[in-house]
Amino acid sequence: MAGGSGARETRCRQGSRPGSPGSEVPAASVTGPRAEARPAGGGGGSRRAAPDRCSGGVPSAAWQHPFLNVFRHFRVDEWKRSSKEGDVAVVTDKVLKSAVYRIRGSVSASNYIQLPRTSTQSLGLTGRYLYVLFRPVPTKHFVIHLDVSTEDGQVIRVSFSNLFKEFKSSTTWLQFPFVFETKTPRRDLAGVALPRARWTCLQLDLRDILMFYLGRHYSHLKSIRLCASLLVRNLYTSDLCFDPAVTVTEARRAKLSVNPMPREMAFPVPKGESWHDNYIHVRFPSDCSKVPDEQDEKSCSPPEAVFLGRMSRHLPHPGVLGKPLLSSKSPVAQACSSALPCQVLSASSRLPEVSRTYRYREVSSVSASSIQSQRPSVRDEVPDAHTVSGERHVLADRSSGVPMALEDIGSCRLFLPDPVLRLKGVIGFGGHSTQWALWTKDGVAVVYPCHAVIIVLQIDTGQQRFFLGHTDKVSALALNGSDTLLASAQVQPPSMVRLWDFQTGSCLSLFRSPLHTICSLSFSGSGALLCGVGKDRHGRTVVVAWSTEQAGLGGEVVVLAKVHTDFDIRAFQVAFFDETRMASCGRGSVRLWRLRGGVLRSCAVDLGEYCSLELTDLAFAQALDGHCAPSAGTLFVCSHSGHILEIDHQRMSVQHVRRLLPARSPGAPLAEKQNFSVGSGIAISSLSVSTATCAVGSEDGYLRLWPLDFSSVLLEAEHDGPVSSVSFSPDGLRVLSTTTSGHLGFLDVPSREYTVLARSHMAPVLALSTEPNRGQMATVSLDHTVRIWDLATLQQLYDFSSSEDTPCAVAFHPTMPNFFCGFSSGAVRSFSLESSGVLVEHTRHRGAITSLVITLDGRFLFSSCSQGSLVQYSCADSQCCVLRVAANMVCQDGRPNPNILAVSGDSCRLAFVGPSKCMVTIVESASLDELLRVDVSTLNLASNHLDWAVAICFSPGNSGHLLVSTSSNKVVVLDAVSGHTLRELSSVRSRACCSLALSEDAHLLLAATDRTITVWDYPTQANPSCQVYIGHSEPVHAVAFTPDQLQVISVGDAIFLWDILATPERDGGDHEAPPGHEAGSSSGQLDDLASGASGLPRQQVPIPFQALPPPLSSHDRLLDGSTGTFSTSDEEGLCEENHVSEALLQGQAPTPHVLVDREASGAGDAPRETAGSSWTPAERPSPHSHMSEWSLRSGKAGLPTRPDSYKHFTPRYKTSPRVKSVYFPPIGRERLRLKAIVGYNGNGRANMVWRPDTGFFAYTCGRLVVVEDLHSGTQRHWLGHSQEISTLALNQDGQILASASCCGNTAARCQIRIWDVPKGLCRHLLSHHDTAVQALAFSPDDEFLVTLGDYADRNLALWSMATYELLSSTRLLEPVHGVAFNPWDANELICVGTNAITFWLLQHHGADTCFQVHREPIPEELGASELTSLCYGASPLLYCGSSSGQVCVWDTGTGHCFLAWEADDGEIGVLLCSGSRLISGSNTKRLRLWAVGVVPELRRKGSSARSSSVFMERELTLDGAVVSASFDSGMDMGVVGTTAGTIWYISWTEGTSTRLISGHRTKVNEVVFSPGESHCATCGEDGSVRVWSLASMELVIQFQVLNQSCLCLAWTPPSCELPEQQQVVAGYSDGTLRVFSISRTAMELKMHPHRTALTAIAFSTDGQTILSGDKDGLVAISHPCTGMTFRVLSDHRGAPISAIQSTSKEYGDLGVEGVELWLAASGDQRVSIWVSDWLRDRCELLEWLSFPAPAVSEAPGLLPPSLAAFCPWDKAILVCVGLGAHEEVIFYSLRQKQVIQKTPLPFFAMSLSLSPGSQLMVVGFAECMMRLLDCASGTAQDLEGHDDSVHLCRFTPSGRLLFTAAHNEILVWEVTDP
């Protein structure tokens, strides 16, 4: 037995004690406390075990064979060599009929059994397999911890628990979630053990777990801890793989190679039953063999499955593969084929198809290490070749009923050779830092990092060698003097350090440093000492020294010393002449270090007057012999101010100080020492010293060589960016330099020639394109560059950059030396490689370009943008011209994806994802006529989530296959003609494939999945094998084959070039099967899935629908409201630019005879003219007239383009017409009074104000201004606007509120209302803007109001608040995003927008007022072209937020920007500043608090200011983009509004956010009330059911169902009085019905009685029956207690059910028997009335009413629904409204069988409600109004308040309150007495 440090002998014992689980086995004692030693430094430590022997000298492994009973061996019942804690007891299990241990308790960590007794002991069990016989306690959690020792002495903890939600791994811990999941739709059982949890045999392959997940070799099992809650029978270890379901007789008869479970370990199986009918077998991670069993084919699928769920985090070695279970007794292979990605390990031989026993040769793991073929094989045999790559889960499932045939496994083919890809080259440098580049000892190679890869580049040959293994970017490098050891650290905290054998490339040691992050590493000359500098988790600087002496001999790296420091360290270096001495420098500090006696000590050098210098780098002087330095050792230190300090490290004193200044002329001498404050020195970032010269790199981009006396510059080389590091080669003849712009090269001093070694993109690469003739590749990146590379040399050929525009997509022309590039601005440019310039530019897109693709014949180019437009170009010649522009064709996705578009190999077809992300459309490439449209969401019927397309790719040639990558991590192969699914390939990663590429011979399929590359053996039909390759540290954005098909390219953080090792020749058996055969098999699978996914059988499999014939003309398509496509010809002389209006994009038909003129500022292909930066007077138009005829047209017919900024207000699209005349009741006689409004308009912008000093709080909802008292919750409502309100503004004294609404059909222009806050009255109405008002702002003295029009209006208007006159109005050249007055000067205001910031000065000439304008462009260094928000800080600071997430600070006195920092990942729409605090809110839902107190001090530094002093104090994530915010003067508390319709109270002091106002974001479909009127419930299109307190209208409970809409709702009737009986039933768009308990706040039942969407639902009067109607007209009757649907009525089939209502009746009333009366109304104007007695199963049709309706074309606008309701004051009277011959309400008597009354209405009714308390009826109309009818007196009153069609009216049960809804607005009205 493996145990202590030496061999120990013990006697073999036998014995048994009654009542103890287990049986007799040989036993050996546990090793004592001295069995292992822990090294200093913590962590897992080194735990090496020596062999142990039993008496008689038998090796330790022998006595454990064939298996070991762990409980018996360690006598668990005595608790001497084991321990227990908490509730642990021995009980008798009824199923096993034996004694078992029960471990239970609420806290797992406090209730457990542990073996051995103490952690200092070791079990020393060497068996490969551990068998855990246990049963989870129902509805509880459990945890199993295993401490496993590796051959190198490392202890790894392996844990399994159903508490874990995801897989987690580190170098010392593996956590596997053990998830119980049902195959039924109930999700509330997921996670905890099921109520019918079974005894489980958990079989763990400890050897494979360590090898697959950590790459380590298993030694022995050290300890076990079983934690609550579970029952455990026993534990066993063995080297044999047992199958519990196979008996000895079966194994012998079938000659199986598996071992039957020993009788002692077996569970009892009742006679006549199978093992799997009673128990569960879990094998993880592999199975030993495939055991076919014919009986298994007849078994049924069990209701539960136990598995470890799909994980999201990455393995340290994702390429190392795990294996799933393949036993026919537990056919997990079948489960993997549908739910989990199956994969085949590569091997040179095929799987045998006849033999039942499979054994294969040794195979290497497909990982980064296997690419170099440096890692030896990890196992002697591979029992099976089916694997799951990259997954971390355990499956335990009973027979599925669809067993996998033996031929299916045999048909899986293997890659030849293995691996199929080998990394050849990497284009890139840096990643985290660009300062690390090292020379090798011989000076022939350079070592540098590229993100997570370390590259060794041979200078002469250009050959690259790689060190792979890091999972994050490399932060530091160090190479010892003899080139034997290489050390590297990675960024991800806690920082991991790898120690490499530099010659072989193998990793000698991987250890966790005590540092949170490491920024510097330094070796001693011999390599025995490694020093590291970094930060701990608290931000303190730490220096660590490690001993690496034993690393090369298989030993460990030991921490020698560690010290915390308070001073800054920028550079740290171990002296080459004495490895116990070091030096460091930083801000104002140079320290000399010494390591003695395991302690690091340092002493500061007295710098005197230079103590405030910012020191950046240091270097020891070199001697001629390389052993000792001249002058007893000199240390050179450089500074950011240009000073060079020479320090004698022995005397610890400064010898010389020189300051380097830029030379006035070549060779001009510089002073040896100059005054500290004189001149501007060279900002030195790095230096390196040789025997006679010193190399200096500076931030001005120069590398300069100086003599050691620094008398003159010997040589200099200019770079394209600041130099970050310099380094002399060992011979001193070459100087290596790196720049912050990703440049790596060296200067050859003798020849004075500079050689470029590597260039790099400085941001993620988004897309690539290869040129077929010249071997070139183009890449585009977020660093605003387009680069052309030579694929043979990996060198950069061209570099095109744009400071204002980001390239997003690229495509080479197949025949001409041109390429096309799409940009974030929507421009598509054609570049010539011959002239290195732009040939033509097109700006037809409104959004960022997402994809570019060109046909293989070079005729057509296609581009798509984030707004969904598709543009077709003719590119047959160099002058590319636009052919067609189609709107709303492509999926609107803001992220660039090169695989959204795809062209077929014959250039005849174009495929794209669109018009929605669930659709894939194929059109003709020449005409864009639609050929096929496939709904991807119907391809995976078993999924509970909506599936959508991510990437597409045509198969090569004309094979007619289209490959679609879906969001469910699958690649679906479709027939491009019929749309049938031919096959599916499951991704081995947990994320979807964002890029696809298929080789020309259709043998290899590439997919980019997160940070990995997956390669499939595409011709294999069943379970195709695949391999996964790592190396990228960020997501891979695109993959492609080179034109010669010999290499693979992947781009993401860098550019990787892979060699394809597979030969293109394949045997004939690998060709694809005929499409027809595949389609047939696939359809069958879909049919099975369809019938299993829902409770009802499907009539047919959902198949892609064939598109309609192409329209006769594109003009007709536009008028139909369908996808807009139109053509232009450059030869016809028409306008080159054609925009699609907002109305067309929303499906509206355009107004006839609309003339589209090009805007004067250039919205088309021509360059835009921008205003200058000088002060110019702005044109002042007449206050009462428009500027010009063109200005008038631009607002209506100019079809402006909406900016790509969420700051701009866009009114919600409405189809409801406005009524021009409303009959309001006299004042004081209103029967309805508006009491409360539920919700906040998240569609507005800056539409919420709060004044902390007065407590005034106002916000908007629709066209109402809501003024709310935050203490009492009472509301006041200011009515007056006729359209949706866009923004609010409160003046400085808080007495005036301005509100602006957009224009509409009742208002030709926008309304701006001026409100008196104390009185709540409208003082004045202003009108000037044509479309919408973007922003309002009061001047500091409240004399002026400035109003800013939106992107379509573009007018800046100034108003006098004294006279309310328009003083000035200016037409802007481009949209402006924000405006603000200068708080210190009422005559100055500032606007922010595109490319510039604009200063406006008010000049008063008598009664006239005009503007003077000064435009200041945005500095190119910011890289931000859109400023979207602004606010003033301390004078004279102005803070501006950008669309790219930057905050820049301007000095308004000088008009210059002096500081900027990255404040967010998205667009910043809100900025607030007060004192030393700044708040930013963005569309990423984040609200951040910044400390900006140092900014005024930084202003004095000007352009040299750095943003590192600005830091974020707090951050909160809200539920939507931030659109409005108000805070107190101290910025401690405030209120914030989001696009989700929520207003939050923010407390920065507590770091909390509390909901103040909440509402539905989407349409409200129903409102219901509790019988006692204490609560109400609403449901919406977003799938939410919300329960509100009726007294306070505060949200109490919310039930959310994802990806479904909740369309109807009902509350249990008054007969259910008890609280536990209070339930809400909701109907959803997928046909499901869910019952929610209010008291338990949980879903109690889910039913699926309908195939289509539910449209109406109601309870019976006793609450024991649910009536539901659907879109097809079916009415289902169900029991909520049992979930059974016992009756379906189809009388209304063909028309949707619009209303269902039930009421009680006397048993014999109306001449029929029954206690309940209920009705159903349908959309075809029919109403059925039924009498029922559900307890007696009686339901009879009482009456059938059908009302005449006009033709559909006669009804204007939206069709009204058919509604009916029982009259509360006479239940025998029916009230009906709908689409009839007249607008009226019909009263029908069930007793008289006739219509007794008709009440005329002004319009067709959209909603109806009758009051139970009085004879009142409310009817809602599409005209945004409603009418209250008093049925007793016959009077009527009209009411307004809503902004859209009033589609919902509901009285409360008492009739005191009325709820009305229009879209997401809910208004609560109080009913008053007459």
From Swiss-Prot:
Function: Microtubule-binding protein that plays a crucial role in ensuring inner core protein localization within the centriole core, as well as in maintaining the microtubule wall integrity and the overall centriole roundness and stability. Required for efficient primary cilium formation.
Highest taxon above the source species: Eukaryota
Protein name per its UniProtKB record: WD repeat-containing protein 90
WD repeat feature ranges: 469-512, 514-556, 563-603, 677-716, 718-757, 760-799, 844-883, 944-984, 988-1026, 1031-1068, 1280-1325, 1328-1369, 1371-1412, 1422-1460, 1462-1500, 1559-1598, 1601-1646, 1649-1688, 1695-1740, 1800-1839, 1841-1874
Species for this entry: Mus musculus (Mouse)
Keyword Zinc applies: no
Region annotated Binds with microtubules, chain positions: 59-267
A Pfam entry, by short name: Beta-prop_WDR90_POC16_2nd
Subcellular location: Cytoplasm, Cytoskeleton, Microtubule organizing center, Centrosome, Centriole; Cytoplasm, Cytoskeleton, Microtubule organizing center, Centrosome, Centriolar satellite
